[in-house]
């Protein structure tokens, strides 16, 4: 069911719980093909790329069931979410094509917003929003796609700005939620994985623009943080 009270934004009510990855659960990076420019800085794999793809396909299926037949507007939070977003909408389009059910509306309309609240691995506490006029989302079903829910600050602040224009509903899709004491308790509605509080790279996650091209989600080494910290 697509309808959801705006005041429930960020509470995760009625969601299917994410795949829980226990603390200290890793794969040895030597068991994977790691590009030479990444190898010195990655020694632990948290989420293999194949697992990520399969999990995103399941999220797309859940989203399809929720919004089928409705006009869905999906907002990609740039640029960290681009990889997750592209994979998600590819699966959404494929699922609708072969679902066997006819719909008079496209599976989604895509939009892009640039938000920035991090430098190095720390939230600055200040949110910068670069986007078109948010009023286009008035009376629309909106799904915000973010790569990770960490402190929750970014999506809380952006959510407040979006609420002001009066969307019909607002939900969050994210690949990863961190279990961290720094969280403001914001929860996503469609969540791939629940992980411990470690800094991750790969599969579109970066550290100051490095490692986005790595195919797996890995834990960033101390050596990488020292070398690439700005």
Curated annotation (Swiss-Prot):
Q: Specify which residues bind Mg(2+) according to the UniProt entry for this protein.
A: 206
Record's InterPro entries? HGPRT (IPR050408), Hxn_phspho_trans (IPR005904), PRibTrfase_dom (IPR000836), PRTase-like (IPR029057)
Q: Any idea which GO molecular function terms this record carries?
A: guanine phosphoribosyltransferase activity; hypoxanthine phosphoribosyltransferase activity; magnesium ion binding; nucleotide binding; xanthine phosphoribosyltransferase activity
A Pfam family in this protein? Pribosyltran
Coiled coil (UniProt feature): none
Q: Where is the signal peptide?
A: none
An example Gene Ontology cellular component term from the record?
A: cytosol
- The answer to keyword Ligase applying to this record is no
**Catalysis performed (reactions):** IMP + diphosphate = hypoxanthine + 5-phospho-alpha-D-ribose 1-diphosphate; GMP + diphosphate = guanine + 5-phospho-alpha-D-ribose 1-diphosphate; XMP + diphosphate = xanthine + 5-phospho-alpha-D-ribose 1-diphosphate
Q: State its Enzyme Commission number(s).
A: 2.4.2.22, 2.4.2.8
Q: In Gene Ontology terms, what is a biological process of this protein? A: GMP salvage
> Pathway of this protein?
Purine metabolism; GMP biosynthesis via salvage pathway; GMP from guanine: step 1/1; Purine metabolism; IMP biosynthesis via salvage pathway; IMP from hypoxanthine: step 1/1; Purine metabolism; XMP biosynthesis via salvage pathway; XMP from xanthine: step 1/1
Q: What is the effect of changing residue 150 to A?
A: Strongly reduced catalytic activity
UniProt cross-references to PROSITE patterns, sorted A to Z: PUR_PYR_PR_TRANSFER
**UniProtKB keywords:** Cytoplasm, Glycosyltransferase, Magnesium, Metal-binding, Nucleotide-binding, Purine salvage, Transferase
Q: In which residues is GMP bound?
A: 79, 146-154, 178, 199-200, 206
Major localisation: cytoplasm
Q: What's the record's note on cofactor binding? A: Binds 2 magnesium ions per subunit. The magnesium ions are essentially bound to the substrate and have few direct interactions with the protein.
Q: What class of enzyme is it?
A: transferase
User: What is its subcellular localisation?
Assistant: Cytoplasm
Known partners and oligomeric status:
Homodimer at low ionic strength and homotetramer at high ionic strength.
Family according to the record: Belongs to the purine/pyrimidine phosphoribosyltransferase family.
Q: Which NCBIfam families match?
A: HGPRTase
Q: Mind telling me what this protein is named?
A: Hypoxanthine-guanine-xanthine phosphoribosyltransferase
- Tell me the organism: Toxoplasma gondii
Gene name, Swiss-Prot/TrEMBL = HPRT
């Amino acid at each position: 069911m697509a309808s959801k009270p705006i005041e429930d934004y960020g509470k995760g009510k009625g969601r299917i719980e994410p795949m829980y990855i226990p603390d200290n659960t890793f794969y040895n990076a030597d068991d994977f093909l790691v590009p030479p420019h990444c190898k010195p800085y990655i020694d632990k794999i948290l989420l293999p790329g194949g697992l990520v793809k399969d999990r995103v396909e399941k999220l797309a299926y859940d989203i399809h069931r929720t919004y089928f037949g409705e006009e869905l507007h999906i907002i990609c939070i740039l640029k960290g979410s681009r990889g997750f977003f592209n994979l998600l909408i590819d699966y959404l389009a494929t699922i609708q094509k072969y679902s066997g059910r006819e719909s008079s509306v496209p599976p989604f309309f895509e939009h892009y917003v640039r938000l920035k609240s991090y430098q190095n691995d720390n939230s600055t506490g200040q949110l910068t929003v670069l986007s078109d006029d948010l009023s286009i989302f008035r009376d629309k079903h909106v799904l915000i796609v973010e790569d990770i829910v960490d402190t929750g600050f970014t999506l809380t602040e952006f959510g407040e700005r979006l609420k002001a224009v009066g969307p019909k509903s607002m939900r969050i899709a994210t690949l990863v939620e961190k279990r961290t004491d720094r969280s403001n308790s914001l929860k996503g509605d469609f969540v791939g994985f629940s992980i411990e509080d470690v800094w991750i790279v790969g599969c579109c996650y970066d550290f100051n623009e490095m490692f986005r091209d790595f195919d797996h989600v890995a834990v960033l080494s101390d050596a990488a943080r020292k070398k690439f910290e700005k």
